[in-house]
Amino acid sequence: MEQLFQFLEHHTDFVILGLLGLLSVICLWKAIERIMFYSKVDISKYDTLEELDIDLTHNLTTISTIGSNAPYIGLLGTVVGILLTFYHLGQSGGDIDAASIMVNLSLALKATAVGILVAIIAMVFYNGFGRKVEENKLKWLALQSKKPHQAV
């Protein structure tokens, strides 16, 4: 058990913050791809609304998933940090140092803060892109209503 706590103490920040950093890079990469796609999409080349919808919503699930799960990853880091704080408190033999406890708890909470930050950014992108999807679908429908109907 001692080895587990030593491992957690030395690697939790790197793993949790590294994972959140990776997720933020993936989110930014997908967001840049979507921005480039939306700026160049030609809705008139699509024959059906379904085909347009598939292309418009590509990568949005990834961005949404990052936005929904980043706080939980941060919370996991906080839980591990609090667990380590209690472990060290128990190992101290009842010698309570309030300053040390507060420092450890504040460091544990940084993981949640980073997770929330990643989630906020991802959800801002997701909601903005959701609006772009709706706009382009409505433009496509308006374009279709202006086309002369062909007899089948």
Swiss-Prot record:
Q: How does it assemble?
A: The accessory proteins ExbB and ExbD seem to form a complex with TonB.
Q: How does it sit in the membrane?
A: Multi-pass membrane protein
Keywords in alphabetical order, please.
Cell inner membrane, Cell membrane, Membrane, Protein transport, Transmembrane, Transmembrane helix, Transport
**What role does it play?**
Involved in the TonB-dependent energy-dependent transport of various receptor-bound substrates. Protects ExbD from proteolytic degradation and functionally stabilizes TonB.
What biological process terms from GO does the record include? protein import; transmembrane transport
Q: Which organism is it from?
A: Mannheimia haemolytica (Pasteurella haemolytica)
Question: What main location does UniProt list?
Answer: membrane
Subcellular location(s) of the protein: Cell inner membrane
Q: Which InterPro entries match?
A: ExbB/TolQ_transport, MotA_ExbB_proton_chnl, TonB_ExbB_2
Q: Which family does it belong to?
A: Belongs to the ExbB/TolQ family.
Domain of life of the source: Bacteria
What's this protein's name?
A: Biopolymer transport protein ExbB
Please name one Pfam family that this protein belongs to.
MotA_ExbB
Q: GO cellular component terms?
A: plasma membrane
Q: Indicate the transmembrane segments per the record.
A: 12-32, 70-90, 105-125
